[in-house]
A protein has these predicted regions:
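Conserved helicase/translocase motor-coupling segment
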Residues: 1-55, 61
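A cross-kingdom feature that marks ATP-driven nucleic-acid transaction machinery
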Residues: 48-59, 63-185
Length: 185
């Protein structure tokens, strides 16, 4: 209610639809224009809504990692909910049993891990050092932790069993992050 008041939302139905669409896109690259088109408001309105949700710790935008910090400011982030319970409610998930078989299970687990890493960092009085990585070949790692002198890559999976394919993107990113001496481009 406070967020809606801050935004002076005139049509609560559209704002609720926006929240549900965001919950359905957890862990995906955020595209304001796409959401705006789906609910019939301007991209500027969506950006304003996201800004307030971010400032009030309802959502967290995970930026992409680029060595060039200017690119980090212009490329699209991924959106996560700071409260996975809220995300589940927006998705209509009412029990652990339902979650166990829901198509969003993996995304919600990724959301939980990202937000817990973020909270740990913020509770230490530090700014976020979390990113995600995706290259032009669609190699993607869910989380990169920038430790100043090194990067730690984390791939989040909710699967009950290990599959060697889970390592593919991690190995590719590790080649880029930790190249042999003299091979970094």
């Amino acid at each position: 209610r406070d967020v809606r008041d801050l935004l002076n939302v005139k049509d609560i139905r559209l704002f609720n639809m926006f929240l549900k669409l965001c919950a359905g896109r957890i862990g995906s690259v955020f595209n304001a224009s796409e959401i705006a088109g789906e609910i019939g408001v301007s991209s500027k309105t969506i950006q304003a809504w996201v800004s307030i949700l971010q400032a009030s710790y309802v959502v967290y935008l995970l930026p992409p990692y680029f060595e060039n910090s200017r690119k980090r400011l212009t490329k699209s982030p991924k959106m996560y909910f700071c409260d996975t319970g809220l995300a589940c409610t927006l998705l209509g998930i009412e029990s652990a049993e339902q979650l166990a078989f829901d198509k969003m299970r993996g995304h919600l687990f990724e959301n939980l891990i990202v937000v817990e890493l973020l909270k740990r960092r913020l509770n230490e009085g530090k700014e976020s050092n979390l990113y995600f990585y995706r290259d032009s070949n669609q190699n993607e790692v869910d989380i990169l932790v920038n430790n100043g002198s090194s990067l730690d890559a984390i791939e989040v999976k909710s699967a009950m069993t290990y599959n060697p394919s889970f390592e593919k993107a991690l190995l590719k990113v590790n080649e880029w992050v930790n190249p042999p001496v003299g091979k970094r481009t």
